[in-house]
Amino acid sequence: MKAYWVCVYEKIDNAEKLKEYAVKAKPAIEKFSGKFLVRGGKNRTNDGIDSPRNVVVEFPDYNTAVECYDSKEYQEAHNILKGHVVRHHQIVEGG
């Protein structure tokens, strides 16, 4: 069963760091067969916090999604964001 990273950004303090993260994260995600379904774009908040950016990445299965997040390659990219964004990142299994 496929799995997804669902990332809801609450606050972005440094757009340049976000770009740097994206450049480094993309090959790490692709290494684990991750496919971007949503990256930014127009959105409407119906409930909860207004989000300046949303990202959804599809993986072949839950374990692969977890392995990617925990990988050295992705964590190196993730560290670029520390102190520059507030986001909610979940790994969910779905159909």
Language-model segment annotations:
Residues M1-R53, P60-D70, E93-G95:
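Short S/T/G/P-rich N-terminal loop/turn motif that feeds into the first structured element of a domain
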Residues A65-Q90:
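C-terminal structural segments of small proteins and small subunits
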